[in-house]
């Protein structure tokens, strides 16, 4: 898009004709870097041209990072709400960055000069935009949870492999030294056999049927809903604050299982060495008097949501000790000397990342997998989604992590994906 026409294009798309303006294609739409006169891979000293789709609350940190880092050049911003988009554009301008504005992610993803895309939308858009970016030759940083459904996760994993793309999932606790140290101690047996793990997630308000309100002229509400069923507009439904908003609805998010579970369950997977597998049983709170939601692994550990975490985000309990870890510099061990223990040469040492976004940038340049790649993100999101399926059904769900199928439960199996409105199928 010509930068001088950016506002005109955006307003035209907001006013109408959006569904027919651009159709998903089944073929890659990008020109290779070689055709464009650029090397096949981005050089170690080259700037990465970035587009950001979704410019609300969660995007603010990513946008600020990309606008100020020498390694990245923001060339395009996208949002279905022109108020949010205008504010993001003003932020870029204030930092001396000139970029183009889009109301439709498909236009941004089709640009041949963009190398990588941040996907920081509500969860129900993660898969479609990420896959579209990948088939257009872009690497992707997608916020957690990676997808809204299990089948979307499989599709994203397949797309990354098919198109040879780098995907980093925003479960950034893997780039935190305290969480890595806790995971290494557990993985190497320093607290013995782990029987119980407690993860503190908290609760959102229950989903609510809000009264219908007029749709603001600045918002393309149909596109905000995207693949989900039509619902009357209410500002409380679409708001992106951490107190609930769209996150409290199953249609758009995974509630607290996907909000905080995507962080804490991810660290549990890492600590147990289960990045390519997962739990086998999911039990909801309230089933046969259960006080807490939990899931279990075939080899024994039980992961309890919101039990006694002793003030930590994650509490690992073994037969020889305990570890309490959180983001607020909380790192406590029993026995206490584990806190300063140095791993032995024969111990398994985990991937070290000092910064989640820099790790992604490095992976783009080296073409090596980042710390939380698409396969890891899919397995963690699967835990979030299966926990939600069990919660909604009010009964346990059994899972085969090898075949990635729900066992002997046709009703639960149908919930591995959601129906999509006809004009919003996955672009695969």
Task: Kindly give the residue locations of the regions a language model identified.
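N-terminal Rossmann-like NAD(P) cofactor-binding module of classical short-chain dehydrogenase/reductase
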Residues: 117-118
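N-terminal secretory signal peptides and thylakoid transit peptides that target proteins
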Residues: 2-22
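N-terminal Rossmann-like dinucleotide-binding module
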Residues: 17-95, 173-176, 268
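Core domains of carbohydrate- and sulfate-ester-processing enzymes
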Residues: 198-243, 416-418
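Basic phosphate/pyrophosphate-binding loop/patch that engages nucleotide-derived ligands
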Residues: 159-164, 181-194, 213-215
